[in-house]
Amino acid sequence: MKIGILALQGAFAEHAKVLDQLGVESVELRNLDDFQQDQSDLSGLILPGGESTTMGKLLRDQNMLLPIREAILSGLPVFGTCAGLILLAKEITSQKESHLGTMDMVVERNAYGRQLGSFYTEAECKGVGKIPMTFIRGPIISSVGEDVEILATVDNQIVAAQEKNMLVTSFHPELTDDAHLHQYFIEMCKEKRQ
């Protein structure tokens, strides 16, 4: 099994470290050639936290947006954390257009405020159990379509969800010592390959 990690900007190294600890091979995808070269071998894709506007621009500049979108729509499992969640959203409240736009949800960028407003909590996540959650200027999922399953909420806000092959979190599971969500994603990837 090999998981691709979008490595244009953001917390991609932290995701690679978690996958390594779980014994799963990962590959950093920095450009279209990387993606096309590894696409047939990929069991899944991680879109890390970072700055979503910058990542969206780089995806367009590297001509990666449409090929990644097509792969996701064709069933490639994807795990978007924080900025990765924003990349997957069909609608972003403060922007005219979405980026990949594959997941039926509306999100509000930086809803948890400035970096100083970042926080840590623990909450139940459906199918995973109680997990630590680190929020750094995280987005809020303000609404979801009928096919989207809400996995976790904090203070009545949706912070984790899944729609078919797409898993998203408003928080950064890669910044904790808990690998349960990554393991959940790996199981999604295994199911898809069967």
From Swiss-Prot:
Alphabetical list of SUPFAM superfamilies matching this protein: Class I glutamine amidotransferase-like
Enzyme Commission number(s) of this protein: 4.3.3.6, 3.5.1.2
Domain of life of the source: Bacteria
Cellular-component GO terms for this entry: cytosol; glutaminase complex
Keywords from the named record: Glutamine amidotransferase, Hydrolase, Lyase, Pyridoxal phosphate
Function recorded in the entry: Catalyzes the hydrolysis of glutamine to glutamate and ammonia as part of the biosynthesis of pyridoxal 5'-phosphate. The resulting ammonia molecule is channeled to the active site of PdxS.
InterPro entries tied to this protein: Class_I_gatase-like, PdxT/SNO, PdxT/SNO_CS
GO biological process, one term: pyridoxal phosphate biosynthetic process
Active site: 82 (nucleophile), 172 (charge relay system), 174 (charge relay system)
Protein residues bound to L-glutamine: 50-52, 109, 136-137
Subunit structure: In the presence of PdxS, forms a dodecamer of heterodimers. Only shows activity in the heterodimer.
Originating species: Streptococcus pneumoniae (strain CGSP14)
Catalytic activity: aldehydo-D-ribose 5-phosphate + D-glyceraldehyde 3-phosphate + L-glutamine = pyridoxal 5'-phosphate + L-glutamate + phosphate + 3 H2O + H(+); L-glutamine + H2O = L-glutamate + NH4(+)
Official protein name in the record: Pyridoxal 5'-phosphate synthase subunit PdxT
TM ranges: none
GO molecular function, one term: pyridoxal 5'-phosphate synthase (glutamine hydrolysing) activity
The family this protein is said to belong to: Belongs to the glutaminase PdxT/SNO family.
